[in-house]
């Protein structure tokens, strides 16, 4: 069974790891959540044990939903007497996106009406509404004409732990605190004898979550504890209530999970070492922190001290982790000076410890003066935050002489890179572009194309793809090597990346089959995001990365036009255009390529986005021969052939020689009103306008398919729109 576990944006891949560790059969990350394969017991285990999830949603039904009548009918068709007992209370949460029904509250009301009317018609006492603590909480997701109705097995947002007795204005939500601790590797540090320090602990969220994590206490034990027992009974002994009274809830399995969790909590709390330290300048905040720690049952493991960051509490552990949720919104008056003082204090008191600091922005993180080995982004409510991890706080000198200064040539390249980064910044922020071209032989003597790839999971590392153009034979080899080294030095300095994060390739005229040859044996794939689709790329092992950045705006245009339609992608490569069309809502996609390597890659891209199955067909075939034999019709076709290719399994292909034949076959597959996008990057290509006019209307649209980052090289590709 597939069910959905939601989370805050930025935590998806941590949640995948947690879900799998808790026994799920499979898990696939998507935006703000994870699709999970498993049974009801697996879902209930997540309700009890997940430290990262927001909600666990068990599906009841999914159906087409064009309007409010279809919504009502789809919900009313369910056998509600099998789900809700007479007299129970009910709540409905709704999330709608781009639908005929645009108001979530109205959608929730229609769901509630359908449930109540169905039960009344069956002669059952109608449920009443309780939005805070219902017996059964339903969740409606309405997206792209499709409704999914689920039971919220947790009954409430799972970031609530049950121990927060005294909230504080600057509190970090508990599931985000758990994410910070996981990114910091706190559990491993604790196992090795280390400590935990929070110099701005506020109401103690990070420290309490840290204590419960290493004590192996399930979050659900306190969340669902009998409220009357919280103040005077140990967390491992409190009666635990059902999170949901949905009739399908497996009570026996839940009780067994609780018994096991209580046994683990008893052992963990008994062995918990007092190695957690917190300080804050506000005595009221510390009062709240101690009350919360007592409610969580970990007050004896945490030392709280009233102190500013200039006077950090003494720590006796030789190594450990500093965690901190520093002020960063307007209400809390964030300022770079505070961050600078924090960095100074950590360098002075715990220079060899690891630090994981939540900052409001990259500039505030930079103000600490600490060198971040890793950076992550996530949302604390509506606020976007940056988490930096510095290991250690004061790094050991890299070399005896420190970092080498850039040469004059490298400095020139670095200046141009910084200028380009700044020039592209507003456009990138507005367009949500994370992978882009930052340099393309701007300085002729440093002839290379440089692309930036932002990892979306794991450590969210930056990778640089440097494609060096082949130097003329008249340039001495010594000069070629020097300029290459200067270029790479500038790249590493500007983007603050290691050698391992830079892929260097020398671009030469391609030979048939070379696109399949390996350049390295690293096998290092990572994920990036474009237009809401997750994509698998590899910068090191192949000639190309798996993502042609120059076609970015064309892919967006085709995805918009393919909503609810049939999309065909010939010479599909890794299937990025097909995947983005599927994510946007294409009714069906067909992707054709001769390479099994690329089709496997395409399959992985579909799976990353929870797509696939019979609606999304992959075909291994010679594209031209397949088109001429195909009889299906398509609304949107993308044709991006190579300049030249040869294969033992297919005829040689030359785009200049064969394009009329190719386009005639592709246009023949268009539905009435359908469109064909034809693109190629052969610089000397000439479209045979007269021949094409015999079977299609044709318009060149190249300028609108070039984004700002490729504006220096507007001939990177040419694109035509064809229709009948």
From Swiss-Prot:
UniProt KW keywords: Cytoplasm, Methyltransferase, RNA-binding, rRNA processing, S-adenosyl-L-methionine, Transferase
CDD domains named in the record: AdoMet_MTases (cd02440), THUMP_AdoMetMT (cd11715)
GO molecular function: 23S rRNA (guanine(2445)-N(2))-methyltransferase activity; RNA binding; rRNA (guanine-N7-)-methyltransferase activity
Chief location: cytoplasm
UniProt EC number: 2.1.1.173, 2.1.1.264
Reactions listed under catalytic activity: guanosine(2445) in 23S rRNA + S-adenosyl-L-methionine = N(2)-methylguanosine(2445) in 23S rRNA + S-adenosyl-L-homocysteine + H(+); guanosine(2069) in 23S rRNA + S-adenosyl-L-methionine = N(2)-methylguanosine(2069) in 23S rRNA + S-adenosyl-L-homocysteine + H(+)
GO cellular component labels: cytoplasm
Gene3D superfamilies: 3.30.2130.30, RNA methyltransferase domain (HRMD) like, Vaccinia Virus protein VP39
EC top class, as a word: transferase
Cellular compartment(s): Cytoplasm
Domain THUMP: start-end pairs: 42-153
Family: Belongs to the methyltransferase superfamily. RlmKL family.
The protein's role, per its UniProt record: Specifically methylates the guanine in position 2445 (m2G2445) and the guanine in position 2069 (m7G2069) of 23S rRNA.
Protein name, as recorded: Ribosomal RNA large subunit methyltransferase K/L
Gene: rlmL
């Amino acid at each position: 069974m597939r069910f959905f576990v939601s989370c805050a944006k930025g935590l998806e891949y941590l949640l995948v790891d947690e879900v799998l560790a808790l026994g799920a059969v499979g898990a696939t990350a998507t935006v703000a959540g994870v699709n999970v394969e498993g049974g009801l017991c697996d879902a209930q285990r997540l309700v009890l044990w997940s430290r990262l999830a927001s909600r666990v949603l068990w599906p009841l039904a999914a159906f087409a939903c064009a309007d409010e009548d279809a919504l009502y009918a789809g919900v009313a068709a369910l056998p509600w007497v099998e789900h809700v007992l007479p007299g129970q209370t009910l709540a409905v949460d709704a999330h709608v996106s781009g639908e005929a029904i645009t108001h979530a509250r109205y959608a929730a009301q229609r769901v509630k009406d359908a449930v109540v009317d169905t039960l009344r018609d069956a002669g059952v006492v109608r449920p009443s509404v309780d939005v805070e603590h219902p017996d059964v909480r339903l969740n409606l997701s309405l997206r792209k004409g499709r409704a999914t109705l689920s039971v919220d097995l947790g009954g409430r947002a799972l970031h609530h732990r049950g121990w927060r007795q005294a909230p504080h204005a600057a509190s970090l939500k508990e599931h985000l605190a758990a994410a910070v601790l996981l990114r910091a590797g706190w559990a491993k540090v604790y196992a090795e004898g280390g400590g935990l320090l929070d110099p701005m602990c506020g109401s103690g969220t990070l420290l309490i979550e840290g204590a419960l994590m290493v004590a192996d206490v399930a979050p659900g034990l306190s969340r669902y504890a009998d409220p009357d027992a919280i103040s005077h009974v140990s967390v491992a002994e409190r009666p635990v209530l059902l999170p949901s009274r949905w009739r399908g809830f497996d009570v026996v399995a839940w009780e067994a999970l609780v018994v096991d969790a209580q046994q683990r909590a008893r052992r963990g709390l008994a062995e918990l070492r007092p190695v957690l330290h917190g300080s804050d300048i506000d005595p009221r905040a510390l009062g709240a922190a101690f009350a919360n720690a007592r409610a969580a049952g970990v007050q004896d493991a945490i030392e709280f001290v009233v102190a500013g960051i200039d006077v950090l509490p003494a720590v006796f552990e030789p190594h450990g982790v500093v965690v901190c949720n520093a002020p960063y919104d307007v209400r809390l008056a964030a300022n770079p000076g505070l961050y600078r003082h924090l960095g100074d204090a950590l360098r002075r008191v715990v220079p060899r410890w690891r630090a994981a600091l939540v900052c409001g922005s990259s500039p505030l993180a930079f103000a600490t003066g600490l060198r971040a080995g890793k950076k992550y982004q996530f949302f604390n409510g509506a606020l976007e935050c940056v988490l930096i991890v510095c290991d250690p706080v004061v790094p050991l000198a890299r070399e005896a002489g420190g970092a080498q200064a850039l040469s004059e040539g490298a400095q020139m390249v670095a200046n141009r890179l910084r200028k380009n980064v700044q020039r592209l910044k507003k456009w990138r922020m507005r367009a949500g572009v994370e992978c882009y071209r930052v340099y393309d032989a701007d300085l002729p003597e440093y002839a290379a194309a440089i692309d930036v790839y932002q990892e979306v999971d794991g450590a969210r590392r930056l990778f640089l793809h440097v494609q060096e153009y082949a130097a003329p034979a008249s340039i001495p080899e010594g000069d070629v090597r020097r300029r290459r080294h200067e270029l790479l030095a500038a790249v590493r300095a500007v983007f603050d990346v290691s050698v391992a994060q830079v892929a260097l390739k020398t671009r030469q005229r391609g030979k048939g089959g070379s696109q399949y040859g390996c350049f390295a044996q690293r096998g290092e794939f990572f994920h990036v995001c474009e237009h809401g689709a997750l994509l698998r790329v590899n910068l090191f092992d192949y000639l190309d990365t798996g993502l042609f950045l120059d076609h970015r705006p064309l892919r967006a245009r085709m995805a918009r036009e393919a909503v609810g339609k049939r999309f065909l992608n010939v010479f599909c490569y890794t299937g990025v255009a097909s995947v983005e069309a599927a994510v946007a809502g294409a009714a069906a996609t067909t992707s054709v390529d001769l390479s099994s390597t690329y089709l496997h890659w395409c399959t992985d891209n579909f799976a990353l986005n929870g797509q696939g199955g019979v609606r999304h067909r992959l075909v291994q075939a010679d594209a031209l021969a397949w088109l001429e034999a195909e009889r299906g019709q398509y609304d949107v076709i993308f044709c991006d052939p190579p300049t030249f290719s040869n294969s033992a399994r297919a005829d040689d292909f030359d785009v200049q020689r064969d394009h009329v034949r190719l386009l005639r076959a592709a246009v023949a597959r268009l539905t009435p009103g359908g469109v064909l996008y034809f693109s190629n990057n052969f610089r000397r290509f000439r479209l045979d306008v007269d021949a094409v006019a015999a079977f299609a209307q044709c318009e060149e649209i190249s300028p609108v398919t070039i984004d700002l980052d490729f504006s220096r090289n507007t001939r990177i590709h040419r694109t035509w729109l064809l229709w009948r």
